[in-house]
Amino acid sequence: MDVRCINWFESHGENRFLYLKSRCRNGETVFIRFPHYFYYVVTDEIYQSLSPPPFNARPLGKMRTIDIDETISYNLDIKDRKCSVADMWLIEEPKKRSIQNATMDEFLNISWFYISNGISPDGCYSLDEQYLTKINNGCYHCDDPRNCFAKKIPRFDIPRSYLFLDIECHFDKKFPSVFINPISHTSYCYIDLSGKRLLFTLINEEMLTEQEIQEAVDRGCLRIQSLMEMDYERELVLCSEIVLLRIAKQLLELTFDYVVTFNGHNFDLRYITNRLELLTGEKIIFRSPDKKEAVYLCIYERNQSSHKGVGGMANTTFHVNNNNGTIFFDLYSFIQKSEKLDSYKLDSISKNAFSCMGKVLNRGVREMTFIGDDTTDAKGKAAAFAKVLTTGNYVTVDEDIICKVIRKDIWENGFKVVLLCPTLPNDTYKLSFGKDDVDLAQMYKDYNLNIALDMARYCIHDACLCQYLWEYYGVETKTDAGASTYVLPQSMVFEYRASTVIKGPLLKLLLETKTILVRSETKQKFPYEGGKVFAPKQKMFSNNVLIFDYNSLYPNVCIFGNLSPETLVGVVVSTNRLEEEINNQLLLQKYPPPRYITVHCEPRLPNLISEIAIFDRSIEGTIPRLLRTFLAERARYKKMLKQATSSTEKAIYDSMQYTYKIVANSVYGLMGFRNSALYSYASAKSCTSIGRRMILYLESVLNGAELSNGMLRFANPLSNPFYMDDRDINPIVKTSLPIDYRFRFRSVYGDTDSVFTEIDSQDVDKSIEIAKELERLINNRVLFNNFKIEFEAVYKNLIMQSKKKYTTMKYSASSNSKSVPERINKGTSETRRDVSKFHKNMIKTYKTRLSEMLSEGRMNSNQVCIDILRSLETDLRSEFDSRSSPLELFMLSRMHHSNYKSADNPNMYLVTEYNKNNPETIELGERYYFAYICPANVPWTKKLVNIKTYETIIDRSFKLGSDQRIFYEVYFKRLTSEIVNLLDNKVLCISFFERMFGSKPTFYEA
């Protein structure tokens, strides 16, 4: 029997079992049940003394136990690390057992199961059926997984089944209550193992009149009275709410591979199950494959108060307790963890994921026709957009113009769509799927058959969006890759944090190397310095800036220095200069490079003046070995990414290589995380110290480098910053560039693993050509061992606001001067939620104007400053006098929480007062909108005081009175504060700011 593993799960009844859900080549699903064990590792001496004897025991052979406590010394008399070798046993017990001196107890039982039996969680196997006992059709028991799964076979493809769903609930306030608000619609996208896709929506007929029901039937809707009458081939079905809920129960109890929702764990599934129990007394029941255990669908919450989010709110995750092998997957929580977005609402996520450039085909009266294909955008973008368009009802044009779809024509690689849209002047526009221009509260207020049918279209679109997002993010691929890498069940891959997922590969490595790492002392945590961030040399750059990144800097630092708790020889500290000098002189004699590396770190305690960590590089440590595995996997996916042809493949492979990059980089974080199995304070501290020296080394050879006559003269000798080696340190290097090229280089900024190098040229093509040659020369001549850099991009018209804040036009390494550059806003107001649309629009306008001035090169920095400030004053005065912009441009949002130091915090007072006077109260954890409003007769106010008192909550019913105005000065001051930080002339900026607002501006730290 050939099977592919697709999920593992446990039953938690009186008799605990582990189950495998697998699929054969013919598409048949097979469940295999295994005994559940708790695992303990003990020495042979302890094993022999156990009474009663262990239930099962396996020899692990001779293993080396290493004490990884850090040795701190004031001289070079460092004691050798404690180390012993003994025969070890792995004990399996069906119930928890207290065993003295057991080791390796920090690892998960499920990881022990996989590794001890040689099973890959996502592997393909030819099962030896003599080790299988049939329980029922499609379910077997196995007591000997090692022999049963002994024959691993090449991976083969299998079909999967899915249920994507969404619901709509009636509400008269802001949020439905399960006790009073019925479900009006449930929509499903059902994909079975044959690949057949069914789309259907159930409409609650109890919210319609009998006349409307008859009209719906006349229009082609199916009306049913019971579950037995359901026809899943019909797109629209009318039924009572009880029938609607019983159909949901029937579908959810099926054993799909995946049931996928968007925030469904917290809302949709919870609402369905609670409403079902309320109206019928029935519950959704899951049964284990052996039919021995039944559990009710229940949503349980996991509150991680140690990981608090924005506003002090605890990070709460929601989980479905099922035992039938189905993976209930919540896209909302997955995307929150994997993407950094301004908003995690479904419309914002789909807008980010599904967009393409469309060409204007025709302009009509209040309508426009767009076409999209492989000629209007990158290959695959239009095809992905067209797929979503099949159920889409609204399209967002140019970021914020929401247009209703009138007609659409879709083919394999493109589309044509007619939109209800104001006439727009350009020939091409960005089209995306954002927010539908509908008000659900108003729709329920005016509810009738036509509205019910409209809502059915919105509901099925949201259900299908779950499928489109599932495919866009490559969740299935990531799940299988994660299961294999982390040695975890597919259902648990995204449940744990980095400190837990790392345990599987770590355990695997320790068993391969026959190593046990133990501590006898309490882990101590001290602060340490992070990565090096350079101060920007200036604000605006008319010349091009080349961006070079170290490839996986921290992982490669760990590999280079062999940083690991067991390779740490010791830490030498000094309390006075004489002691430090003596230690420094003797260190290199006793611990000579390259076998040893000595890392100078900042002292951990105030009474120390120096601290040096010493690592032995002769035998590769646990952490470097682990990192090599992750980096090899990342390299494999990067190679697949380069060979990929479609945008979908590229997205999946790019996300996979990025996942391995994140996992590899997380190892550094785990070295400094006290609760991690990899905790090693000296290693984490040494990692950042070496990283800082590497970025300073690269900056030192590039800052002042010159290119002429085909030769590149680096600014400093190419000396290894850690120890002398046999490399050629001559800074003059021959290039393959034309001999007439003459350019100078200047380092202008750097951050942790990247260096920004200005070249005295504005030619994009030449800059890219030179940067690629620089990349080759740096990797071949400047860097050493496993360190490599990569030329990432040319930044044109770079505007540096401060450290980690900049705006630029980015030309990637694979582009040329004819390519459309990407606008990058790093850490700036355009990417923040707590900034008004007015601010974002204005700052975008002024940055664009600055970029154009830099490109033209006709003005010096003083002239640019004068021109920008003069224009800004005109714009602000004009807006203040006309007061023409709508209120929505000035709205801000904030999360309501109670984690304030002061009990009378003005934010809390604002919401409390609002809730007293409004039936729709603002709940804890909810975002609300507010604006600064003042009396209309207040003149331009220079000095702003007590601005919190002008905050007004903006809800759906708010209208700006004739005696009120927007308190523009608050917004203008914030905008001007950001703009003056873009300009180089501080004197002019201060003078302007004082004249407009009566105070000096705050300049960002360099």
From Swiss-Prot:
Highest taxon of the lineage: Viruses
SMART domains hit by this protein: POLBc (SM00486)
Any one GO biological process: DNA-templated DNA replication
Keyword terms of this UniProt record: DNA recombination, DNA replication, DNA-binding, DNA-directed DNA polymerase, Early protein, Hydrolase, Multifunctional enzyme, Nucleotidyltransferase, Transferase, Viral DNA replication
InterPro entries: DNA-dir_DNA_pol_B (IPR006172), DNA-dir_DNA_pol_B_CS (IPR017964), DNA-dir_DNA_pol_B_exonuc (IPR006133), DNA-dir_DNA_pol_B_multi_dom (IPR006134), DNA-dir_DNA_pol_B_vir_insert (IPR013617), DNA/RNA_pol_sf (IPR043502), DNA_pol_palm_dom_sf (IPR023211), DNA_pol_type-B (IPR050240)
Entry's Gene Ontology molecular function annotations: 3'-5' exonuclease activity; DNA binding; DNA-directed DNA polymerase activity; nucleotide binding
Keyword Transferase attached: yes
Enzyme Commission number(s) from the entry: 2.7.7.7, 3.1.11.-
Annotated effect of mutating S338F: In PAA-R mutant; phosphonoacetate-resistant
Catalytic activity field: DNA(n) + a 2'-deoxyribonucleoside 5'-triphosphate = DNA(n+1) + diphosphate
Induction behaviour: Expressed in the early phase of the viral replicative cycle.
Subunit structure, as described in the record: Interacts with OPG148/A20. Component of the Uracil-DNA glycosylase(UDG)-OPG148/A20-polymerase complex; OPG148/A20 and OPG116/UDG form a heterodimeric processivity factor that associates with OPG071/E9 to form the processive polymerase holoenzyme.
Family, as annotated: Belongs to the DNA polymerase type-B family.
Note: Ts42 is a temperature-sensitive mutant. PAArVg is a mutant resistant to the drug phosphonoacetic acid (PAA). NG26 is a double mutant with a temperature-sensitive lesion and a mutation rendering the virus resistant to PAA.
Role: Catalyzes DNA synthesis. Acquires processivity by associating with a heterodimeric processivity factor comprised of the viral OPG148/A20 and OPG116/D4 proteins, thereby forming the DNA polymerase holoenzyme. Displays 3'- to 5' exonuclease activity. Might participate in viral DNA recombination. Does not perform OPG116/D4synthesis across an abasic site.
Name of the protein this chain belongs to: DNA polymerase
Organism of provenance: Vaccinia virus (strain Western Reserve)
Taxonomic lineage from the root: Viruses, Varidnaviria, Bamfordvirae, Nucleocytoviricota, Pokkesviricetes
